[in-house]
């Protein structure tokens, strides 16, 4: 069972992050921890997933939100991935940055250098946290916490390739909202671990036909019914529920 929770730029206090042209993506060895699939087989342990990281004490989708989740021994974090104008994968839930930063504009219409010039809010207060690169989050989380990736872009392949490059495929869930997207991910790698969102019984049946074995699925409130849950249990599907 998984349950989801929901500066002065002229004199920066910390060294600036690399600009897009300088971003490096090192090869790393495979993460040897127990896979999510194996971990979910422990039915005596309710795993906690921190939605957008540990946002209670840090900006959502930030490096600090990830490190605090690790420090508080959370089992998993959920993160949202988008792409900047110049093709860098960053963390941001919304299509625009107004709600979470002191900047304006769509993520897809801003270069990473522009995104980096803004700071993230937490509880209405501006912090020193910046919009992080997805790869920085993977490196911070690697070997320490599982990840549920809510991919907000159509290019699942780019996200998959980076996760694979960092040896984390057994540690990551890919959230999917429809069967066609599930097929795209499966075509990339039959062993990729999907987290389909279930709205009705037909969804459960469709995903089982495409993804079986299906280790876990997320159920919205309308799908949280006895017959759908029985169908999931009978097919070895663990429950993921936002509360």
Where are these regions (language model features)?
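Sec-dependent bacterial lipoprotein signal peptides
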Residues: 1-3
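Phosphate-group recognition and catalysis centered on beta-loop-alpha active-site segments
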Residues: 5-243
């Amino acid at each position: 069972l998984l349950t989801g929770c929901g500066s002065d730029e002229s004199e920066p206090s910390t060294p600036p992050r690399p600009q897009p042209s300088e971003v490096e993506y090192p090869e790393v060895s495979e993460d040897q921890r127990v896979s999510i699939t194996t971990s979910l087989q422990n039915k005596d342990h309710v795993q906690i997933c921190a939605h957008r990281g540990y946002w209670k004490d840090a900006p959502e989708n930030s490096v600090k939100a990830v490190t605090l989740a690790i420090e508080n021994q959370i089992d998993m974090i959920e993160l949202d991935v988008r792409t900047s104008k110049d093709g860098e994968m960053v963390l941001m839930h919304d299509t625009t940055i107004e709600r979470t930063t002191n900047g304006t504009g769509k993520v897809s219409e801003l270069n990473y250098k522009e995104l980096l010039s803004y700071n993230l809010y937490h509880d209405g207060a501006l912090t020193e946290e910046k919009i992080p690169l997805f790869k920085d989050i993977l490196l911070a989380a690697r070997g320490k916490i599982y990840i549920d990736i809510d991919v907000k872009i159509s290019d699942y392949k780019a996200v998959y390739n980076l996760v694979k490059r960092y040896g984390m495929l057994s540690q990551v869930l890919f959230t999917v909202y429809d069967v066609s997207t599930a097929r795209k991910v499966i075509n990339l790698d039959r062993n990729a671990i999907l987290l389909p969102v279930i709205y009705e019984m037909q969804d459960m049946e469709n995903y089982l036909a495409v993804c079986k074995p299906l280790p876990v699925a997320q159920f919205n409130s309308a799908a949280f019914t006895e017959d759908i849950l029985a169908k999931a249990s009978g097919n070895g599907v663990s429950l993921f529920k936002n509360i």
